[in-house]
Design a protein with these regions (language model features):
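N-terminal secretory signal peptides that target proteins for export/translocation
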Residues: 1-7
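Long, well-structured alpha-helical subdomains associated
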Residues: 134-176
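Short pre-active-site segment immediately N-terminal to the catalytic Zn-binding motif
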Residues: 88-103, 115
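Active-site recognition of the HExxH zinc-binding catalytic motif
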Residues: 103-112, 122
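Sec/Tat signal peptide C-region and signal peptidase I cleavage site
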Residues: 24-28
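Catalytic zinc-binding patch centered on the HExxH motif and its immediate surroundings
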Residues: 55-84
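Bacterial N-terminal signal peptides
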Residues: 11-22
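An active-site-proximal "capping" alpha-helix that borders the catalytic cofactor pocket
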Residues: 116-132
Length: 176
């Protein structure tokens, strides 16, 4: 017995829906990045997870909501973020002042709450630092000295433009 024309169309709709759902799921997994345990296992020697609320940087206990931080000495930058967790390179961080270390953590935390926009993450970081009293005007200038030489790229403005925007955020009472 052959299926009726209507049954064939219904079967095609079900098959296409399944393909679209699976494609959407694959895309979502790709966007979310690897789970923290998978990242840590693949990061190489020395990577470890610090649970939320247990990270201490230069005698400052810091957190990013309920998100853990991976300390990864093999990371090719000072910090990074995937949705749900932060990544810091302790070997690179030991070379910069405390205000810069805390700003880097807060910047990566900003991505958790403000998304991928770098300017919003910068603003989040300096406003958080000001509110939590670990970032002063002098500390902001240390951050600006740190990023000042940076060239812009597809995600970041050049260092001087980023500093100008961060100074405005630091001075503003509006939470951004």
């Amino acid at each position: 017995m052959q299926p009726s024309r209507g049954a064939g169309s219904a079967l095609l709709v079900v098959a296409l829906t399944a393909v679209l759902v699976m494609a959407g799921t694959a895309g979502a997994q790709e966007f979310l990045g690897p789970p923290i345990e998978v990242y840590t296992q693949n990061a190489g020697k020395g990577a470890r997870i610090v649970p939320s609320g247990q990270l201490v940087i230069d005698r400052h206990r810091i957190s990013c909501g309920n998100r853990a931080t991976v300390l990864d000495p093999n990371l090719d930058d000072y910090g990074a973020a995937y949705p749900g967790y932060l990544i810091l390179n302790p070997k690179l961080l030991e070379k910069v002042p405390t205000s810069v270390k805390l700003w880097i953590h807060a910047h990566e935390c900003g991505h958790q709450f403000r998304g991928s926009d770098e300017e919003k993450a910068d603003c989040f970081a300096v406003q958080r630092g000001r509110r939590q009293k670990w970032l002063t005007a002098e500390g902001l200038e240390q951050v600006c000295a740190f990023i000042g030489p940076a060239r812009g790229d597809s995600m970041h403005f050049a260092g001087p433009e980023r500093c100008q925007a961060m100074r405005r955020c630091f001075a503003s009472s509006d939470v951004e």
